[in-house]
Amino acid sequence: MVIKKLFILIFCLFLIINEINGKKTKINDIKKSKPKLSSTLLNVHIVAHTHDDVGWLKTVDEYYYGSNMSIAFAGVQYTLDTAITCLLANPERKFIYVEIAFFQRWWDEQSTTMQNIVKGLVESGQLEFINGGYCMNDEATTYYDDTIDQMTLGHQFLWENFGVMPKIGWHIDPFGHSATQARIFGQLGFDAFIIGRMDYQDIEARLENKQMEFMWRSTQSTPENQVFTSVLRAMYCTPDGFNFEQGDDPIQDDPNLFDNNVDSRAEQFTQVALEYATHYRTNNVLIPFGCDFAYLNAQMYYKNIDKLIAHINSNPDKYGLNLLYSTPSIYIDAVNDANLVWEVKTDDLFPYADNEFSYWTGYFVSRPALKGYVRQNNALLHVVEQMLVTSSNLMPSSRSEQLVDDIVIMREVMGIAQHHDAVSGTEQQHVADDYAERLSIGNCASLETINTVVGTLLTANGNSKSAAATPTISFCPLLNQSICPATDPLSSGTSVPVLIYNSLSWTRNEPVRIPIPIANVTVTSSSNGSITSQVNQINGTFILEFLATIPPLGYSTYIITSTASDFVEPNSIPAIIIQDEIIVSGGGKINEKVSYNDPIILENDYINVQFSSQDGSILSITNKTSGVTSSITQEYIWYNPSVGNDDSAQCSGAYIFRPVEDFAYPYNNATPSVSIIRGEISSSIRRFWSNEMVQTFRLYSNADHLEVEEIIGPIDISDGIGKEIVSRYTTTLVTDQTWYSDSQGMEMQKRITNYRPSWNLTVVQPTSGNYVPVNAIAYIQDPNQSLQFTIVTDRSRGCASLRDGQLDMMMHRRTLKDDGRGVGQPMNESTQIVTTSKLIFHDISSYAQSHYRPAALSLSHPLLPMFTTTQQSSNDWNSQYQGVYSPLTSASPLPNGLKIQTLQWLDNQDNTILLRIENIYQIDGQDSQDPQTITLDLSTIFSTITITSATEMNLTGVQKLSNLSRLKWKTVDGKNYDHKSSSSTKEDSSNGFVFTFSPMQIRTFIITTN
């Protein structure tokens, strides 16, 4: 007890002395003493850890507080309490922690004294933060924006409170690994990426060939972001027989006891360590001690590990081992010191299977409504972050600071939602409900903030405007369900101004669809007067459509007025009212107005699309600009989820997609009702089978793509059979089994059906084994005809190309059996989804990325309509309020290809802003022209912000790029990229803040303003 108190006192005195000297020591700058490693013995790095899911079987709160123990015996607060106590009892012990969402809660509950003690443990290296994100994010269903944001949230906390920046990526539980995740970890400056899961065939080959560690160069565009990767030998839990917290025999080393077992237990552990060593190339092995929510009673672990280490190390000749408490960073340093040459991997780690019948490809689609809601809130968070920065000069600093504090709610809930059992859809139902509720709370908080900011912007700039009453802003979150209470005042003659916000970095000329209660309206633009509009009358509802021109990071206003209102301007243009025309009734009866064989044609200046007059199905698509044509069909099919059979008991469930057979059934054999709308703004074909299956093909007058809106679900299980629903597109393209999918919305990955670049694949599951995640983009190409067919999605899905010229997109799934991977519930979700895709068909030589990249960003960052009301004419309203706003210097201040990815306050008291700018195009070698490096002067972007300094940082904004130092590794190809090889390291540009951006590069800056 005396030693323990003295140990604590020394820590506290050390911190007090630092404070007195006025120093804020950054722990990354402190050279910790290296552990004693052996050059002749096998060094066994024991890594004490807990894997704390930020929700899974229990909610985040239940896991933290330890409630609902009947579901899972876990309480993170007790884990941290007991682990810290055990570290203080023995300075040799170490512990790593990963999930900052939990640690931040625990930290905030601690006294100042305890916080200082913990800082001392971090200083000494006993407690080390690994990975350091708000959660351990999924890699298949997360968007790259969200991944970077949640890592930033965790790293900012660690830097502000401890002065540390993690150096190792630790993703030991996600169910497959993406190229983008590896690239992000490289750009963060991580020295290594440690993973726990790898396909069973891949890992068998690697174990045999000692290739469990390699250099992962996952991107052609930014190869300097390669990262050394190490695969754990046997997942991330304690070796069998040594889980002292869960009932395995303790180490009994008292020679006076009859049941002394220290020799046999040491021999047992030695065999484990030596087996591990046969698969790795250095005399170092990492053996994790811990598992899910481990160290709830940390003393049970540490006391026994102490004995194991002491006994084995006292007998080096007998056991041949050097055991030590270690961390992943210590282990990686030791591997690096071996100075070996490493193989290079360039493909990703999808799909993942843990045996021949179990491909983890179902979760790419599980809970698609939640996946869509997460994506929607990502877009909203970026809107509110942008607004808070660009409007802060218009409001009192105290008000601006409060609004920035308010948005932390949304940042944190979005950080939680990226967890690998959250957006992935692999949680229990009550946990999914909890995530949705948290997102809803964050959503409401964000909309309240936007209401305040937009009110400020509307009344800014000019005395007359500033004297106007601040309007109240409302929103219509159910626009995709044709519900918008904000437009109800039109029925009583009140006009409805609609402010439409664009969060992208270029002017957008896009269609807007708004449900309205009446048909006879006009639309007036704040900048262009009365404009053409269209009202579609469908099943008794009215949908207003018009083309809106919106400046970057800003809004434009369009005022909707009833033609019967007293506020109609004399020269206003009434909306064109269009009644949908029934072409085919539900029973398949053909309307006499249409010849049986004549196709239905939707056409604009860019594309021509033909549909069957029998059932409204798509027949062909022609790109009128390049003159290329392909026949194309689309059908809904479903796979019968396995409930186990003689080959394997494996069921299809939350994680696993395992169909009973590779044959897929037509989802609905009935002929749908088909209706058509033709208008100046849009024309569409609507196919209605039932309220559970509706498909609309929509062609806008200014679009080079075809939009597809689909309503699917709840999935019918009245026959007692679950269903996994796929939308299959079949073209005449000859694709040679090759197709492409994005990686978390970023770089495209080449896929070849029934093939893996890294090993010789034995095909056992030809359907589920070929599905990979798609977050935004999938396409097929016919090089001989120079044709490309692209599908752009609004949320993550699973995709495959099982036949030449085909793309299969899994849309929704509902299974009736648990798949045995821990969640303990079937994927029996009864939700309906409303989802939007874009179909793009073009000549490869027409620089394909310029078509699909902006289209994908448009879906991921949709325009945001904001509504208010007025009892004024549009002219009077425009004279009082700022109807058009952009904080940028022009309609296109950024060169084509550059995008402001992040614009958010770091500290608005110090006027410091986190700014990320990305080049959205990649080097892929497929286009006739690859993107070039783009130059930008940061000082020319903003009109409302004057940049006084710009310091380039690592990706999460906590470490100067000029100070970033990574371990050097040798590779078999000799390409040992410098992390800064394509990046300027100048902190403050003396030439107008000029920087260059190579293809697919994201550069991060902390800028200060006046």
From Swiss-Prot:
Pfam families: Alpha-mann_mid, Glyco_hydro38C2, Glyco_hydro_38C, Glyco_hydro_38N
Domain of life: Eukaryota
This enzyme's EC code(s): 3.2.1.24
Cofactor: Zn(2+)
Site (Cleavage): T507, R508, K589, I590, K593, V594
Signal peptide: 1-22
InterPro entries xref list: Gal_mutarotase_sf_dom, GH38_C, Glyco_hydro/deAcase_b/a-brl, Glyco_hydro_38_C, Glyco_hydro_38_cen, Glyco_hydro_38_cen_sf, Glyco_hydro_38_N, Glyco_hydro_38_N_sf
Family note: Belongs to the glycosyl hydrolase 38 family.
Full protein name: Lysosomal alpha-mannosidase
Source organism of this protein record: Dictyostelium discoideum (Social amoeba)
Gene designation per UniProt: manA
